[in-house]
C-alpha cells in the first residue's frame, strides 16, 4: 500500500463480532463432540485371522466407540492386517458355531452397538475367507516377505526411555508404518541371525558408501575359478543387489556368514564392530589380489602417520611411518576422572607428545647416551573415508572387571582435519627413518586396540539421555574453500548396553537425499539430527569417575566420515549404469524372489493335517503329514495319501478312502460319500495352522464294501469273551447312536457277531479298571456313559455264571485279569560253566547254607543235574497246553480267592503252577516250602533300590496279543446274504500315542482282600501280600529276539498279572533260570538301555508296562542289611590308576576283615589275584580319589557308612600295613626334579599327626633332601593330580606358610591327599626351543591320554575369524 492512501479495508464492528461468535460456536461444538466421545461407551474387538496358518495364533485388538459404523470396523481391520477391504469376512467368534452365523456386512452403516456388539466386554471375531477365496494382500504388504506377516500383529515397538528393556533404537519420528513397509524409506533391513547386529550395522554402512558399492559392482565373479558359496565378494555383491532391489522388508545374511566359513554357532558369538571391520577388510584384500580392486581398501580407508622420537639435546629425530585403517580415540585418559569433551579434543590428545625422562630416557644415537626426548605421533595422510573408533570399553583395576565408559563425547557433522596434519615434517633436516612399515603393518597405529568379544547379551539399555546441548559447530563455506580436509559425517555405529553385552545399530546419512536413517537390524526408519546428538552419550557437566554408569548406555562407538571433495565424491550407480554381470545377477535374484513368492502363496493355500493309516498286511498304525492344496479334490487327496503311505504294491487305489478321524479318542467321525469332487479346503474348513481332527486312510478288502460313518454316531469296539476258553477276542467295530437303548444295542451287536441277544451280557469299560455291566435294558447308551469312542466286552454263553453277582462272576475275574495282564520280554542269563555250588558259595557264613542242598533238588531234573532252559521250555510246552482253570482251582483246594486263571491263548505256563510235572513242585508244595524257608531271604532292602523304580505307569496288554480267535464284521442284506464290511479299525486295537503318554506316570490303585497299611503283617514269608494270592497269573513262552543277543542267551515272552509281587515273579522264573530266586537278580531295562536292579520284593509290577524288557543276571540277591559294592583296584603309579575288579556283597555288622576274607576267593576265581589278607587294604573311593583307609576292626554301618551302589578301593600293599589307628594320616607324595624335568613315582607317607614339620621330616627321610631345603605343594584336581612338567615349577603354591595340614590353603584332613615336593636348591633345567616343543608335545599327549588335565579357567573370548577357504578346521593355527 502506498503511504498516505486511506483505502485499507476495515471490517465493520458487527461483522467482526459475528465472525468471532461463529468461530466460538464451532470450537464449542468440537469440544462437545470430544467430551461426548470420551463419555461414550467403547467396544473392545479382538479379531483372529484364520485365513493364514502363520497368523492364526495372533490377535488384532481394536477399541472403538460404540457408535462406530460396521464399515469403519472393516476399514480399520483392513488397514491393520494389510488386506484389501471387501476381500474378507468377519464372523462372530464368541463360542458360536461360525458355520451357522452370517458374516457381518462390510458396507453396513449400522453402529457397533446396533450390530449386537457389547460395550465393556470382549467381542471376539474371526477373519475368514470371503466366498471361499482368501483375502487379497495390499501390494506394499505383499512385498514385506514372510516375516512381515507376523509384524502386522506386534504393534509399535517400545519408545526409547519408556521403561522397557529393549535395546532397539527408535527415533522420535517413529511411526508404525515407517518400519512396516519398505516404501516409506526405500531401504531394506537385515535379519539378525542371533547376535549378528554388529555385522548388520557394518554391512549397511558399506552398502550406503557409494565408492565401496560401485567398486564392488565392477568386480566380476568367475564361477569357474571359485565356489560361489565361499566367495566373500560375490556374496556381498548378492547382498547389496538384494538390498537395492528386493521388495522384502528385511533379508537374511546367512549366505554372507557362510562365505566367512562360519557355522550356525558363530551367530551366537557377539563381537566388536571395529574388529569385524578390520578382519573383513583383510579378507577382501586377500580375495581381490591381482584384480582391479586389489588396492581398493587402501585407497578408501588407509592413512599414514609418523611415529617419532626427538632428542631434546641435539634435536636428532628417529621415526618410522605406519599405516592405519582407523584412529582409536580414548574417551577418558588413564587415571583421569574427566572425559574428553569432543572428538577434536581426543584427536589433539592422540597426537600430543610425551616426554621420556628419568628411567624412561631415550638412548640417542648421535649423543651416544641416554637423553630426555619427546615421543609422539604425527598424521601424514588422511584417508578418503576416515574411521574413528571411540574406545568406550576399559578395564577397572579396582573391581577387576571390564567396564563401558558412557561419558559424553560430542562429534561434529563436519570435521576439519587440516589442523592435525604435519606440515613441518618435510622441512626438518635432522630426521632419519628407522623403519618404513607402511607395506607391512597395515593396521592400527597403536597396539592397544581393544577387541571386545561379547558372549552374553545381558547388557541393559537405560535409554538415551535427553540433554542435547552440544558444542558442535559447522564449518563455514569459506572454510571449505580454503581447506581440502573437511570431512562429512555419514555413519554413526551405536552400541547400546554394557561391557558384558549389548546391541549394535547404525545411523547412516544417505548421500542421495541427505536424510538420516536408523538401520536397526530389520527395522529401517527415518531419524533427525536431534537423534544423532543423543548418541553423544552421558550428559553435560562435570561428573565423578563412576557417574557414567548411571547415564545413558546408548552411545556412538564408531564414526565414519567422508572427505568433501566434489571431484572424488561419487554417486550410486543407476540401474542402467550397472555392468552386464550385475544386470544378470539382478535378473537372477528377481526370478528367485518371484519363485519364493509363488512358493509362499502355495504354502499359504496348503492344508497340512495329520494322516493315519492302518497297514492292511502289517497291521501297524502309520502316521504322516498330508500337505494338500486347498483346491485339490478329495479324490486327488486320496491318491496323494495312497502314494505317501507306500500302498501301491499292497492294495488297489479303489480300496482306499479318506475319512475324518479323531486319533486321541480313536474315533471315526464321518465319511465323505459322494464328495469325491469337493475341494479339500471346503471339506477341512479352510487352511489352518492346526486342525481339531485328523484324517485316516481307510482300506478294505476287494470283496468288502465301505461302511458309512455319519456325524453323531458313536464308535464301539466290541470284544467277544469266551468263558470256556477263557479268551478275549480282538475287537470289531460297530457304530451306534447315544439315544439307542441297551436292548437295541444288543440287537445291533447280535447282527454283527451272530450271538443271541437274549443271553447276551455287555460290560462297558469306561476307564481303566472301571467295568460296568449294562443290566438295565431300557436305559440309553448316553445314560450309561457312552462317549465318542467306547470299549465293551460281550459274552453270550448259557452257563450259570450270569446268575452270580457281577463282582463275583467268572466274567468279572476274566476281564479283571485281562485288564491287568502285561507282556514282558525277559532275557535269561547265559548258561555259565560255573557249577551251581560255586554260584551259591558266596553266601554269608551262617546264612542259609543248610538249605542249599534242598534248594538244589527243587531245580534238578530226574537225573540229578540242572536242566537247561530249552529242556524246561520244551517239557512245559508239552505238558501244560491242556491245563484248565478247573484243574488249577482243584489244586488250590477250591479257594476261589486264590485261584489262578488260565486261558488257551498262551503256550507256556510257569512250571510252578503245574500240578503233575516232575520239573517243579505244585502250588501247595511251593507254599509249604516258602513257609519253611528263611523269611530273611525275602525281606526288602529299601535303600538298594533306584529312584527310577518309583516311577509308576499303567498299561494294559493289547487285545490282539491276548486273543486267540478273531471275528470279522458282517451285516445281512435284504436277501439274508452276508456282506463283509470293511472297517478302518477292523481286528486291531489302535492305542492312541497321545492317550498312552497321558497315562504315563500315573500310579495305579486296586482293591485287595485287606487294605495296604504298609506294615510287615500284610506280607507272608514269601513276600506276597495276603490279598495278592489271587493275582498269580503267569504265562511264559519262548521268544525269538533280534540278532545280537549273544550265544547262550534265551528270551522269554511272559504274560503276567502286574499286581503280582516281585518275589512271586522271581519264583515263577526259577525253573527257567535254573537257580533259586535268591540267587539271581532282576534288572529293568529302560529306553536308553540303562539297567536298574529291582530289589523291593514286596512291591508289585505295577510300575512295569507292556513290552518292557527285563534282564536276569546270576548272583545272589540282597538280603536285608546287605549292600552291593563295586570293588576297584587302586594302582597309584599306573597310567590308569582305577581298575574295576568285581561286584561284592557287604552286610551290616560285618567287619572289614570279614569282608576281606570273603573277597579273597572271589578275587582268585574272577580276577586271578592271589592275595593274603594282610597284604591288601580297603579304602574309601570318592569318584577317582582315594580316601580314608579302612582298618580291619572297623564295622560297616557303625564305623563306616555304607549305601547302595557303594564303591571301594582295594589297594595291594608292598609290606606290612602301617596304618594302625584313625589318628594317623596317609598321604601320597611325589618328588619333582626340576633339573631333570621329571616326576618320581608315588610314595605313601604315614603321619602320626597333621604337623607340617613331621611331613617335612618324613619327606626328608625318603628322599635324602636336607630338611631345610624341602619345599612342598598340594596337588590340584582329581587323583593323580596330573600336571605338565612345564607348569609344575611355577603354577603350584609351593611352600605354604602354615604349621598344620588341616588349615587353609591345604585343608588336608583325610587320607589320600597328593603332595608334590622338591629340593629348593635344585636349579630348573634350561630348555632350548626345540627341547621345549618336544617336551610340550609329549606332555600334551600324556595328559590327554590320562584325561586328568586341569582345564578349568574363566571362559576365554573367542577371536573373530573369517576363513578364506570356507573351512574353519584348516585355520586352527591362526591367532
From Swiss-Prot:
Query: Per the record, GO CC terms?
Result: cytoplasm; cytosol; nucleoplasm; nucleus; SCF ubiquitin ligase complex
Function statement: Ubiquitin-specific protease that specifically deubiquitinates monoubiquitinated DNA polymerase beta (POLB), stabilizing POLB thereby playing a role in base-excision repair (BER). Acts as a regulator of cell growth and genome integrity. May also indirectly regulate CDC25A expression at a transcriptional level.
Enzyme class, top EC level, equals hydrolase
**Residue ranges with Basic and acidic residues bias:** 912-928, 940-950, 997-1006
Write out the tissue specificity statement of the associated record. Answer: Expressed in skeletal muscle, heart and testis.
Q: Which organism is it from?
A: Homo sapiens
Its annotated compartments are: Cytoplasm
Listed Polar residues bias regions:
430-452, 929-938
* Compositional bias ranges of the Acidic residues kind: 1007-1020
Residues the record lists as Phosphoserine modifications: 832, 910, 933, 1013, 1017
Sequence segments annotated as region (Disordered): 425-452, 840-859, 880-968, 983-1024
Q: What Enzyme Commission number(s) does the record list for this chain?
A: 3.4.19.12
Q: Which GO terms describe its biological process?
A: base-excision repair; DNA damage response; intrinsic apoptotic signaling pathway in response to DNA damage; monoubiquitinated protein deubiquitination; negative regulation of intrinsic apoptotic signaling pathway in response to DNA damage; positive regulation of canonical Wnt signaling pathway; protein deubiquitination; proteolysis
For this protein, the record's CDD domains field holds: peptidase_C19C (cd02659)
What the entry lists under Pfam families is as follows: UCH, USP47_C
The similarity comment for this entry is: Belongs to the peptidase C19 family.
Q: What is this protein called?
A: Ubiquitin carboxyl-terminal hydrolase 47
Residue ranges occupied by any USP domain in the UniProt entry: 188-564
Provide the transmembrane region boundaries: none
An example Gene Ontology molecular-function term: cysteine-type deubiquitinase activity
Please write the reaction equations for the catalytic activity of this protein.
Thiol-dependent hydrolysis of ester, thioester, amide, peptide and isopeptide bonds formed by the C-terminal Gly of ubiquitin (a 76-residue protein attached to proteins as an intracellular targeting signal)
Q: Which UniProt keywords apply?
A: Acetylation, Cytoplasm, DNA damage, DNA repair, Hydrolase, Phosphoprotein, Protease, Thiol protease, Ubl conjugation pathway
Entry-linked PANTHER family: UBIQUITIN CARBOXYL-TERMINAL HYDROLASE, UBIQUITIN CARBOXYL-TERMINAL HYDROLASE 47
Amino acid at each position: 500500500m502506498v503511504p498516505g492512501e486511506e483505502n485499507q479495508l476495515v471490517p465493520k464492528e458487527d461483522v467482526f463480532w459475528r465472525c468471532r461468535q461463529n468461530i466460538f460456536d464451532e470450537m464449542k461444538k468440537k469440544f462437545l463432540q470430544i467430551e461426548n466421545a470420551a463419555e461414550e461407551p467403547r467396544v473392545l474387538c479382538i479379531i483372529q485371522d484364520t485365513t493364514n496358518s502363520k497368523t492364526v495364533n495372533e490377535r488384532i485388538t481394536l477399541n472403538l466407540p460404540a457408535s462406530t459404523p460396521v464399515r469403519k470396523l472393516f476399514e480399520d481391520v483392513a488397514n491393520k492386517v494389510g488386506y484389501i477391504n471387501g476381500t474378507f469376512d468377519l464372523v462372530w467368534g464368541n463360542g458360536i458355531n461360525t458355520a451357522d452365523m452370517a458374516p457381518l456386512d462390510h458396507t453396513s452403516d449400522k453402529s457397533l452397538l446396533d450390530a449386537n456388539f457389547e460395550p465393556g466386554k470382549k467381542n471376539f471375531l474371526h477373519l475368514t475367507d470371503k466366498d471361499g477365496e482368501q483375502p487379497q494382500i495390499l501390494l506394499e504388504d505383499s512385498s514385506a516377505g514372510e516375516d512381515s506377516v507376523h509384524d502386522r500383529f506386534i504393534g509399535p515397538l517400545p519408545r526409547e526411555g519408556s521403561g522397557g528393556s529393549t535395546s532397539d533404537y527408535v527415533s522420535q519420528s517413529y511411526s508404525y508404518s515407517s518400519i512396516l513397509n519398505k516404501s516409506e524409506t526405500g531401504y531394506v533391513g537385515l535379519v539378525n541371525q542371533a547376535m549378528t547386529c554388529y555385522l548388520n550395522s557394518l554391512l549397511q554402512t558399506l552398502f550406503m558408501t557409494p565408492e565401496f558399492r560401485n567398486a564392488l559392482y565392477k568386480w566380476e565373479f568367475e564361477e569357474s575359478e571359485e565356489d560361489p558359496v565361499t566367495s566373500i565378494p560375490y556374496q556381498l555383491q548378492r547382498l547389496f543387489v538384494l538390498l537395492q532391489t528386493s521388495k522384502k522388508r528385511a533379508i537374511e545374511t546367512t549366505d554372507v556368514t557362510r562365505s566367512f566359513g562360519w557355522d550356525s554357532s558363530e551367530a551366537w558369538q557377539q563381537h566388536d564392530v571395529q574388529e569385524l571391520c578390520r578382519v573383513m577388510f583383510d579378507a577382501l584384500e586377500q580375495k581381490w589380489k591381482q584384480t582391479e580392486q586389489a588396492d581398493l581398501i587402501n585407497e578408501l580407508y588407509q592413512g599414514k602417520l609418523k611415529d617419532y622420537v626427538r632428542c631434546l639435546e641435539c634435536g636428532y629425530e628417529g621415526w618410522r611411518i605406519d599405516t592405519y585403517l582407523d584412529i582409536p580415540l580414548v574417551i577418558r585418559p588413564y587415571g583421569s576422572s574427566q572425559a574428553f569433551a569432543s572428538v577434536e579434543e581426543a584427536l589433539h590428545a592422540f597426537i600430543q607428545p610425551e616426554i621420556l625422562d628419568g628411567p624412561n630416557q631415550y638412548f640417542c644415537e648421535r649423543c651416544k647416551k641416554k637423553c630426555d626426548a619427546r615421543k609422539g605421533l604425527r598424521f601424514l595422510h588422511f584417508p578418503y573415508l576416515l574411521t574413528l573408533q571411540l574406545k568406550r570399553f576399559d578395564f577397572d583395576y579396582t573391581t577387576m572387571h571390564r567396564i563401558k565408559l558412557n561419558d559424553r563425547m560430542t562429534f561434529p557433522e563436519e570435521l576439519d582435519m587440516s589442523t592435525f596434519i604435519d606440515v613441518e615434517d618435510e622441512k626438518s633436516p635432522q630426521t632419519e627413518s628407522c623403519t618404513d612399515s607402511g607395506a607391512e603393518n597395515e593396521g592400527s597405529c597403536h597396539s592397544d586396540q581393544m577387541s571386545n568379544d561379547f558372549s552374553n547379551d545381558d547388557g541393559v539399555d537405560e535409554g538415551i539421555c535427553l540433554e542435547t546441548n552440544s558444542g558442535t559447530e559447522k564449518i563455514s563455506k569459506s572454510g571449505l574453500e580454503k581447506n581440502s580436509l573437511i570431512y562429512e559425517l555419514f555413519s554413526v555405529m551405536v552400541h547400546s548396553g554394557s561391557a558384558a553385552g549389548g546391541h549394535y545399530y547404525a545411523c547412516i546419512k544417505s548421500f542421495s537425499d541427505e536424510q538420516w536413517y536408523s538401520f536397526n537390524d530389520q527395522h529401517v526408519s527415518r531419524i533427525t539430527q536431534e537423534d544423532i546428538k543423543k548418541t553423544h552419550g552421558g550428559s553435560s557437566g562435570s561428573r565423578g569417575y563412576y557417574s557414567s554408569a548411571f547415564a545413558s548406555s546408548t552411545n556412538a562407538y564408531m564414526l565414519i566420515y567422508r572427505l568433501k571433495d566434489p571431484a572424488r565424491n561419487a554417486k550410486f550407480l543407476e540401474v542402467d549404469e550397472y555392468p552386464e554381470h550385475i544386470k544378470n545377477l539382478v535378473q537372477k535374484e528377481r526370478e528367485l524372489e518371484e519363485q519364493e513368492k509363488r512358493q509362499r502363496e502355495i504354502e499359504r493355500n496348503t492344508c497340512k493335517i495329520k494322516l493315519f493309516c492302518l497297514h492292511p498286511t502289517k497291521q501297524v498304525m502309520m502316521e504322516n503329514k498330508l500337505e494338500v492344496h486347498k483346491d485339490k479334490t478329495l479324490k486327488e487327496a486320496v491318491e496323494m495319501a495312497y502314494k505317501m503311505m507306500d500302498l501301491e504294491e499292497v492294495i488297489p487305489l479303489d480300496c482306499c478312502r479318506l475319512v475324518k478321524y479323531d486319533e486321541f479318542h480313536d474315533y471315526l467321525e464321518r465319511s465323505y460319500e459322494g464328495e469325491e469332487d469337493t475341494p479339500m479346503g471346503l471339506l477341512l474348513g479352510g487352511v489352518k495352522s492346526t486342525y481339531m481332527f485328523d484324517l485316516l486312510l481307510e482300506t478294505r478288502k476287494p470283496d468288502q464294501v465301505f461302511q458309512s460313518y455319519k456325524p453323531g454316531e458313536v464308535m464301539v469296539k466290541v470284544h467277544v469273551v469266551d468263558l470256556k476258553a477263557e479268551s478275549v477276542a480282538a475287537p470289531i467295530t460297530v457304530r451306534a447312536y447315544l439315544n439307542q437303548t441297551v436292548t437295541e444295542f444288543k440287537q445291533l451287536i447280535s447282527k454283527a457277531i451272530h450271538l443271541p441277544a437274549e443271553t447276551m451280557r455287555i460290560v462297558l469299560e469306561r476307564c481303566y479298571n472301571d467295568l460296568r455291566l449294562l443290566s438295565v435294558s431300557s436305559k440309553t447308551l448316553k445314560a450309561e456313559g457312552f462317549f465318542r469312542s467306547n470299549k465293551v466286552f460281550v459274552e453270550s454263553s448259557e452257563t450259570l455264571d450270569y446268575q452270580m453277582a457281577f463282582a463275583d462272576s467268572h466274567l468279572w475275574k476274566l476281564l479283571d485279569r485281562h485288564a491287568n495282564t502285561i507282556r514282558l520280554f525277559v532275557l535269561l542269563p547265559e548258561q555259565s560253566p560255573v557249577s551251581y555250588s560255586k554260584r551259591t558259595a558266596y553266601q554269608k557264613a551262617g546264612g542259609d547254607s543248610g538249605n542249599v542242598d534242598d534248594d538244589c533238588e527243587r531245580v534238578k531234573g530226574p537225573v540229578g543235574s540242572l536242566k537247561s532252559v530249552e529242556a524246561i521250555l520244551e517239557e512245559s510246552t508239552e505238558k501244560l497246553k491242556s491245563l484248565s482253570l478247573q484243574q488249577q482251582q482243584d489244586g488250590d483246594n477250591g479257594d476261589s480267592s486264590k485261584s489262578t486263571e488260565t486261558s488257551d491263548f498262551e503256550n507256556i505256563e510257569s512250571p510252578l503252577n503245574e500240578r503233575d510235572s516232575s520239573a517243579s513242585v505244585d502250588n501247595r508244595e511251593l507254599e509249604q516250602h516258602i513257609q519253611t524257608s528263611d523269611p530273611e531271604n525275602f525281606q526288602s532292602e529299601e535303600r538298594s533300590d533306584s529312584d527310577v523304580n518309583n516311577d509308576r505307569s499303567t498299561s494294559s496288554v493289547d487285545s490282539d496279543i491276548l486273543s486267540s480267535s478273531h471275528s470279522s464284521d458282517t451285516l445281512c442284506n435284504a436277501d439274508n446274504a452276508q456282506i463283509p464290511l470293511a472297517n478302518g479299525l477292523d481286528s486291531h486295537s489302535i492305542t492312541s500315542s497321545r492317550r498312552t503318554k497321558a497315562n504315563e506316570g500315573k500310579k495305579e490303585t486296586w482293591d485287595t482282600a485287606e487294605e495296604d497299611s504298609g506294615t510287615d503283617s500284610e506280607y507272608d514269608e514269601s513276600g506276597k501280600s495276603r490279598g495278592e494270592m489271587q493275582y498269580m497269573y503267569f504265562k511264559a513262552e519262548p521268544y525269538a529276539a533280534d540278532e545280537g543277543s549273544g550265544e547262550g542267551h534265551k528270551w522269554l515272552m511272559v504274560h503276567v498279572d502286574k499286581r503280582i509281587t516281585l518275589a512271586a515273579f522271581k519264583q515263577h522264573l526259577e525253573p527257567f533260570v535254573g537257580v533259586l530266586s535268591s540267587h539271581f537278580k532282576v534288572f529293568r531295562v529302560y529306553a536308553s538301555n540303562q539297567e536298574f536292579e529291582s530289589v523291593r520284593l514286596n512291591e508289585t509290577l505295577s510300575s512295569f508296562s507292556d513290552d518292557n524288557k527285563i534282564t536276569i543276571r546270576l548272583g545272589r540277591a540282597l538280603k536285608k542289611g546287605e549292600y552291593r559294592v563295586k570293588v576297584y583296584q587302586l594302582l597309584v603309579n599306573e597310567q590308569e590308576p582305577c581298575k574295576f575288579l568285581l561286584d561284592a556283597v557287604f552286610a551290616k555288622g560285618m567287619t572289614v576283615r570279614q569282608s576281606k576274607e570273603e573277597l579273597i576267593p572271589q578275587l582268585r576265581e574272577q580276577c586271578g589275584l592271589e592275595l593274603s589278607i594282610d597284604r591288601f587294604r580297603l579304602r574309601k573311593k570318592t569318584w577317582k580319589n582315594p580316601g580314608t583307609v579302612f582298618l580291619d576292626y572297623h564295622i560297616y554301618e557303625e564305623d563306616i557308612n555304607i549305601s547302595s551302589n557303594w564303591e571301594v578301593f582295594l589297594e595291594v600293599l608292598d609290606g606290612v600295613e602301617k596304618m594302625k589307628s584313625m589318628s594317623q594320616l596317609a598321604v601320597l607324595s611325589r618328588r619333582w626334579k626340576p633339573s631333570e624335568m621329571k616326576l618320581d613315582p608315588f610314595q605313601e607317607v604315614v603321619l602320626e599327626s597333621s604337623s607340617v614339620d613331621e611331613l617335612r621330616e618324613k619327606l626328608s627321610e625318603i628322599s635324602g633332601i636336607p630338611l631345610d631345603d624341602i619345599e612342598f605343594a598340594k596337588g590340584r584336581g582329581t587323583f593323580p593330580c596330573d600336571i605338565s612338567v612345564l607348569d609344575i615349577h611355577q603354577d603350584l603354591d609351593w611352600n605354604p606358610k602354615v604349621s598344620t595340614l588341616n588349615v587353609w590353603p591345604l585343608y588336608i584332613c583325610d587320607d589320600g591327599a597328593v603332595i608334590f615336593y622338591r629340593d629348593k636348591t635344585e636349579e630348573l633345567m634350561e630348555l632350548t626351543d626345540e627341547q621345549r616343543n618336544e617336551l610340550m608335545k609329549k606332555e600334551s599327549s600324556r595328559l590327554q591320554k590320562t584325561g586328568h588335565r586341569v582345564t578349568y579357567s574363566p571362559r576365554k573370548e573367542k577371536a573373530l575369524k573369517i576363513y578364506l577357504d570356507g573351512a574353519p578346521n584348516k585355520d586352527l593355527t591362526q591367532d
